[in-house]
């Protein structure tokens, strides 16, 4: 049983267990009340950066908040697809769930890195620590995925040619 699980699958499942509920709640708070959700603790650095450096109107700020929520929900969707793929043994053994995990890690890393840069620009140390921690978790799982060996295909059993008799029909391709 333990031979079926890859270390990147376990690491990805643990990362998904954190990001799916956390980023879903943050995104739904933004969807319900865009401005109020944007100025909550996980997004305060993005909100302050947008208001200080961009000088956007109210509706443009709402659109930026929705764009952030859409990005986070996209990461959540890829993590959910990854977890669904993990339930199937064929995908898990062959490493087929790696594409969904790679997409979630790459998009999530970009969002966390941008949020971390914005937090450093506006001087939010708590938000900086949060986004740096999220980025390190995502990059750690990405490094595990990159350094892990590819999945080895199961050996195929070949039948001996002596089983063929003269009474068995032969295909036209076997001439």
Residue ranges and their predicted role:
Residues 58-75:
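Individual transmembrane alpha-helix segments
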Residues 28-39, 82-95, 118-121:
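Juxtamembrane transmembrane-helix termini
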Residues 11-19, 68, 101-111:
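Hydrophobic alpha-helical transmembrane segments of polytopic
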Residues 19-29, 75-82, 108-115, 141:
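Helical transmembrane-bundle signal
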Residues 107-175:
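Alpha-helical transmembrane segments of multi-pass integral membrane proteins
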Residues 32-60:
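Membrane-interface interhelical connector segments
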Residues 5-36:
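N-terminal signal-anchor transmembrane alpha helix
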Residues 2-3, 78-106:
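Cytoplasmic juxtamembrane regions at transmembrane-helix boundaries
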């Amino acid at each position: 049983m333990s031979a079926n699980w890859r270390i990147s699958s376990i690491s990805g499942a643990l990362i998904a267990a954190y990001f799916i509920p956390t980023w879903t709640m943050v995104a739904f708070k933004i969807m319900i009340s865009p401005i109020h959700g944007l100025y909550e603790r996980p997004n305060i650095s993005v909100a302050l950066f947008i208001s200080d450096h961009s000088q956007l109107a109210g509706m443009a700020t709402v659109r930026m908040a929705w764009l952030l929520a859409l990005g986070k929900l996209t990461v959540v969707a890829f993590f959910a697809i990854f977890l669904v793929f993990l339930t199937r043994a064929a995908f898990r053994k062959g490493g087929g769930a790696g594409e969904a995990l790679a997409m979630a890690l790459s998009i999530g890393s970009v969002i966390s890195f941008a949020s971390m840069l914005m937090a450093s620009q506006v001087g939010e140390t708590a938000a900086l620590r949060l986004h740096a921690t999220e980025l390190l978790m995502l990059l750690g799982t990405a490094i595990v995925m990159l350094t892990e060996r590819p999945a080895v295909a199961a050996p195929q059993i070949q039948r001996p040619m002596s089983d063929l008799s003269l009474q068995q029909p032969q295909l036209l391709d076997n001439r």
